[in-house]
Amino acid sequence: MGLTSQLLPPLFFLLACAGNFVHGHKCDITLQEIIKTLNSLTEQKTLCTKLTITDILAASKNTTEKETFCRAATVLRQFYSHHEKDTRCLGATAQQFHRHKQLIRFLKRLDRNLWGLAGLNSCPVKEANQSTLENFLERLKTIMREKYSKCSS
């Protein structure tokens, strides 16, 4: 019995430390993946990046960070679901078609990572200002870089 009571405090300490390490490590990995995806997306110049998207980032002053990430994921999902087979985005050449498919794949990856970071099941998105997908992704990249600098320091 005495041995068990002596082992409990160190075990709790190890569990607490491991949980903090994993959480911080996950934060870094997820943010790195999001930033990497955003870098790839913003380098691409496709027909779809000039189309408009609901700009939830412009009106995110009274929302939590998790709500912002959730809403960003929601509008990205709405965008790629609507434009996945959009003939304006597919282009006339095989290269344009390939770039469009790559864009959709990156948007889906970004959506999945933002949902994971948000940790919410759903979030309402009100119609707000419109922005091009290109500008939306640039602003989201700035937000993620700021979060990464805070997370890693």
Curated annotation (Swiss-Prot):
Give compartment(s). Secreted
* Protein family membership: Belongs to the IL-4/IL-13 family.
Which pairs are disulfide-linked?
Answer: C27-C151, C48-C89, C70-C123
**Top-level taxon in the UniProt lineage:** Eukaryota
Regions annotated as coiled coil: none
- Taxonomic source organism: Macaca fascicularis (Crab-eating macaque)
List the keywords (alphabetical). Answer: B-cell activation, Cytokine, Disulfide bond, Glycoprotein, Growth factor, Secreted, Signal
Name of the protein: Interleukin-4
Record's function text: Participates in at least several B-cell activation processes as well as of other cell types. It is a costimulator of DNA-synthesis. It induces the expression of class II MHC molecules on resting B-cells. It enhances both secretion and cell surface expression of IgE and IgG1. It also regulates the expression of the low affinity Fc receptor for IgE (CD23) on both lymphocytes and monocytes. Positively regulates IL31RA expression in macrophages. Stimulates autophagy in dendritic cells by interfering with mTORC1 signaling and through the induction of RUFY4.
Cellular component GO terms, alphabetical: extracellular space
What GO molecular function annotations does the UniProt record carry, in alphabetical order? cytokine activity; growth factor activity; interleukin-4 receptor binding
Q: Which residues are glycosylated?
A: N62
Q: Which GO terms describe its biological process?
A: B cell activation; immune response; interleukin-4-mediated signaling pathway; negative regulation of apoptotic process; negative regulation of inflammatory response; negative regulation of osteoclast differentiation; positive regulation of B cell proliferation; positive regulation of isotype switching to IgE isotypes
Mind telling me which PROSITE patterns this protein's record contains? INTERLEUKIN_4_13
Q: Which residues form the signal peptide?
A: 1-24
Under Gene3D superfamilies, the record lists: 1.20.1250.10
